[in-house]
Swiss-Prot record:
Region (RNA-binding and homodimerization): 1-73
Coiled coil, from the record: none
UniProt short sequence motif Nuclear export signal, positions renumbered to this chain: 137-146
Protein name: Non-structural protein 1
Gene Ontology terms for molecular function: protein serine/threonine kinase inhibitor activity; RNA binding
Native organism: Influenza A virus (strain A/Swine/Wisconsin/1/1967 H1N1)
Length: 219
């Protein structure tokens, strides 16, 4: 096993622990808590894949971080922060909409790269909107936290989420997964719209119905 893979996991575990302590003191906002919950699932998946104990990894990560901080000067820290591009967090969904449980009468599930797609094929002839919470950098979608499909009545009928065991995806991966979800929902006569945030940062183009512009062979 590559040593960088192990040490990266150890540092991630310790930093998650620090963020959890921060949240436990009531100091985290909604986007912070969203990421905390998602990252916990990701760490569990990575730990299982690597065969590493999270508690042991957290202690090792603490030692690594302490060593780095001991060597770090304030001036170096300022230069590092200044050179890192900042990302923005965009939220179509409330925390309640993100954490709400839902079930499918006729489930269809598919894995597309590192993204997990689920939809209820029992839903027919409904108006559906896709909402997503994600981060943006350089005016492009950086990381998808969660995407869900809602009916006008507020019922959840579809979802796209990152697989904890396969971290990392591009805006193109998200676009492809959304097209799969849209195609599955429209198969039963549903009308699907995409939120303005997704239109702007994932596709940069749309048609008059608020839908992503699909390649010619898919129209």
């Amino acid at each position: 096993m590559d040593s960088n893979t192990v040490s990266s996991f150890q540092v991630d575990c310790f930093l998650w622990h620090i963020r959890k302590r921060f949240a436990d003191n009531g100091l985290g906002d909604a986007p912070f808590l969203d990421r905390l919950r998602r990252d916990q699932k990701s760490l569990r998946g990575r730990g299982s894949t690597l065969g590493l104990n999270i508690e042991t990894a957290t202690l090792a990560g603490k030692q690594i971080v302490e060593w780095i901080l001991k060597e770090e000067s304030n001036e170096t820290l300022k230069m590092t922060i200044a050179s890192v591009p900042s990302s923005r967090y965009l939220a179509d969904m409330t925390l309640e909409e993100m954490s709400r449980d839902w079930f499918m009468l006729m489930p269809k599930q598919k894995v597309a790269g590192s993204l997990y797609i689920r939809m209820d094929q029992a839903i027919m002839e409904k108006n559906i909107i896709l909402k997503a919470n994600f981060s943006v950098i350089f005016d492009r979608l950086e990381t998808l936290i969660l995407l869900r499909a809602f009916t006008e009545e507020g019922a959840i009928v579809g979802e796209i989420s990152p697989l904890p065991s396969l971290p990392g995806h591009t805006d193109e991966d998200v676009k492809n997964a959304v097209e799969v979800l849209i195609g599955g929902l429209e198969w039963n006569g549903n009308t699907v719209r995409v939120s303005e945030n997704l239109q702007r940062f994932a596709w940069r183009s749309r048609n008059e119905n608020g839908r992503p512009s699909l390649p010619p062979e898919q129209k």
